[in-house]
């Protein structure tokens, strides 16, 4: 199932990029709808063969998959999803963080090596989690947020859900013992536990990550979630 969904995500992103440079006619749109229907039919057959799924539960899950994929397609077509987007000014960054359901924002300096490293990881996740916006903003362009969030160490990453801060990363300290890097799976799992990225169908599970540790860390923060208080 994971491979099928990943192929669909890749196809949607690829088609969206082509659409920016060409006029989309009705036949192309119909083809996209047929591809979605074909994928859903394949998943239906696959789930039907999986004895772990009870029939009623299988139908519910299939509907969830359908809704999720349609939302993914809409997000990509509306732009802003599927990539790490550079935001040029503070006002736009604030609006995105307060108005978007799920967003991960990286406060960075492009000349700082660790920020470049973080950008690579976030770019990777942005292509896989198409219901979350991933953005980056230069700290020199957002003095209000730098002061508000008390940003003193870079990279500085914050995850918001419905305008509420769910998780933050100051440097790499929460992502392992290596001060110069981290396993992307740690960041992925931590964001998932915080509710900032969603893997609705639990198709990506990494047993190498200590999930209880992340759950405990994010539970502590959830008790004191804060918004931007603009």
From Swiss-Prot:
Record-linked Gene3D superfamilies: Glutaredoxin
Primary location group: cytoplasm
Region ranges (Thioredoxin fold): 81-230
One Gene Ontology biological process: negative regulation of signal transduction
Phosducin domain boundaries: 16-166
UniProt keywords, alphabetically: Acetylation, Chaperone, Coiled coil, Cytoplasm, Pheromone response, Signal transduction inhibitor
Cystine pairings recorded for this chain: none
GO cellular-component term (any): cytoplasm
Membrane-crossing segments per the record: none
Coiled-coil segments on the chain, per record: 25-79
InterPro entries: Phosducin_thioredoxin-like_dom, Thioredoxin-like_sf
N-acetylmethionine sites (modified residues): 1
Pfam families: Phosducin (PF02114)
Compartment(s) of residence: Cytoplasm
Gene Ontology terms, MF aspect: G-protein beta/gamma-subunit complex binding
Note: Present with 2250 molecules/cell in log phase SD medium.
Role noted for this protein: Not essential for growth. Inhibits early G-protein signaling events following pheromone stimulation. May help create heterodimerizable beta-tubulin by facilitating the efficient transfer of nascent beta-tubulin polypeptides to the folding apparatus.
Subunit structure: Interacts with the G protein beta-gamma subunit complex (STE4-STE18 complex).
Family: Belongs to the phosducin family.
Protein name from the UniProt record: Phosducin-like protein 1
Native organism taxonomy: Eukaryota, Fungi, Dikarya, Ascomycota, Saccharomycotina
């Amino acid at each position: 199932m994971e491979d099928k969904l990943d192929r669909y995500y890749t196809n949607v992103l690829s088609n969206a990029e082509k659409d920016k440079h060409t006029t989309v006619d009705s036949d192309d749109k119909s083809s996209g709808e047929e591809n979605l229907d074909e994928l859903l039919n394949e998943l239906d057959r696959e789930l039907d063969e999986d004895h772990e799924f009870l029939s009623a539960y299988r139908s519910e899950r299939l509907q969830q998959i359908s809704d999720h994929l349609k939302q993914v397609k809409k997000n990509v077509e509306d732009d802003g999803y599927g990539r790490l987007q550079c935001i040029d000014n503070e006002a736009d960054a604030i609006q995105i963080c307060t108005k978007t359901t799920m967003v991960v924002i990286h406060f960075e300096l492009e000349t700082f090596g660790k920020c470049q490293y973080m950008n690579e990881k976030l770019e990777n996740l942005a292509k896989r989690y198409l219901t979350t916006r991933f953005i980056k903003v230069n700290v020199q362009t957002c003095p209000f947020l730098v002061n508000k969030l008390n940003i003193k160490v870079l990279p500085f990453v914050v995850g918001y859900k419905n305008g509420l801060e769910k998780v933050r990363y100051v440097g790499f300290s929460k992502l392992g013992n290596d001060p110069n890097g981290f396993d992307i799976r740690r960041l992925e799992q931590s964001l998932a536990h915080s509710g900032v990225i969603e893997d609705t169908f639990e198709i990506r599970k990494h047993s190498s990550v200590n999930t209880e540790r992340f759950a405990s860390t994010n539970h502590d923060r959830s008790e004191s979630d804060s918004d931007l208080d603009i």
